[in-house]
Amino acid sequence: KSIDNALKIAPKAKVYKDYRALLDSNEIDAVIITTPLFLHKEMAIAAMDAGKHVFCEKALAMNVKDCWQMYMKHKATGKIFFTGQQRLFDPRYIKVMEMIHTGVFGNIEGIHTFWYRNGDWRRNVPSPELERLINWRLYKEYSCGLMTELGCHQLQIGSWAMRAIPNKVMGHGAITHWKDGRDVDDNISCIYIFDNGVKLTFDSVISNQF
């Protein structure tokens, strides 16, 4: 069904049902990876091994080890690798960062970020055996939950503003509202600490109801 819908938009597009067949094509120079998180590393490494440049949707991978393997493959192959953090291309964010970095707002003493939503992330499933495949964001086997789906945006903005990466983090999360069989938290709270002592906070809930 998804392929049929896509072909309505781009009827002349060539369709592949296996990404490895796409990577074998000499007609392709680069790929865009917008699959669920747990597939990023496998696909990105395979693409670079096949001589393709890669634009990979955020978050990069499930853990630091996987991210490092992707980075080392980029270094070994010389293929361009870019992570799709869309705010890097947003003129509004670019302008604000210019203002921050030129001192318009003074010194950064602290950063507070949040992402609140009212929704369960759940999608309709036509058959029970497809539950974990379709609702992959709800399960730790396939997703890192709010941290990688939403928190990575806020951490990227904070690091961009600070022109540094935090060296300490603490946080906690829980499932307090959507008790529907998922095992990723539906609310989280984190504190990141930079070398100069500035703290970035991030809070997120997906049950922001009234």
What are these regions (language model features)?
Residues 17, 56, 171-173, 204:
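Short loop/edge segments at beta-strand edges and connector loops
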Residues 77-83, 87-182, 190:
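Predominantly a Rossmann-like dinucleotide-binding segment in NAD(P)-dependent oxidoreductases
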